Every structure is written in structure tokens, then in C-alpha cells.
Amino acid sequence: MSITAERKAEVIQGNANKAGDTGSPEVQVAILSERIVNLTAHFKTHTKDNHSRRGLLKLVSTRRSLLDYVKKKDEARYKALLEKHNIRR
């Protein structure tokens, strides 16, 4: 359900604005998107796992808040994020 340290490092490297960037909204959205995809796959086999489903909803809410922040600051970055991570809006 969680992502490995190696996979997380790959996601960070692929979305960082500069070297050592781990806290920008783009990186945070990328990490959350990766975790959401993993949890979604988990629910295909564990349909009654409501405890984890609540965690998924919290992740989606956090990602939504970050996306709203990026949209408020820079519309072009927001659209690029949606397209890069296949997020429906």
C-alpha cells in the first residue's frame, strides 16, 4: 500500500524543480498520486477494507488542497500537473 523508498526517490527526482527539491507542491502532488494509485489497486482485491478507504479519502483531499494552491498561484503549472499525473478535474 505504501511506496518504497526507491520509488519515492524516483518520483521526487522526476518532479523536482531543482536538485534537493522535496517540498514543492509538484513533488507533493506526485507522491500523493503515486500512493493513491497504489491504494486504488489494493481496493480491487480488498473491497471491504474501509479503514484504508478512509486513508485514501484523506490523501485525495490533501492532494486536492495542494492542487487548489497551485491553481491559485500559477494556472499553467496546475494544468501541467493535471496532465502529467492523469488527474481528472
Swiss-Prot record:
It comes from the Bacteria. The keyword Ligase does not apply. One of its GO terms (cellular component) is cytosolic small ribosomal subunit. It holds the Pfam family Ribosomal_S15. One of its GO terms (biological process) is translation. Keywords: Ribonucleoprotein, Ribosomal protein, RNA-binding, rRNA-binding. One of its GO terms (molecular function) is rRNA binding. SMART domains: Ribosomal_S15. Residues 1-10 have a biased composition (Basic and acidic residues). PROSITE patterns: RIBOSOMAL_S15. InterPro entries: Ribosomal_uS15, Ribosomal_uS15_bac-type, uS15_NS1_RNA-bd_sf. Residues 1-24 are annotated as: Disordered. The keyword Cell inner membrane does not apply. Part of the 30S ribosomal subunit. Forms a bridge to the 50S subunit in the 70S ribosome, contacting the 23S rRNA. Belongs to the universal ribosomal protein uS15 family. One of the primary rRNA binding proteins, it binds directly to 16S rRNA where it helps nucleate assembly of the platform of the 30S subunit by binding and bridging several RNA helices of the 16S rRNA. NCBIfam families: S15_bact. This is Small ribosomal subunit protein uS15.
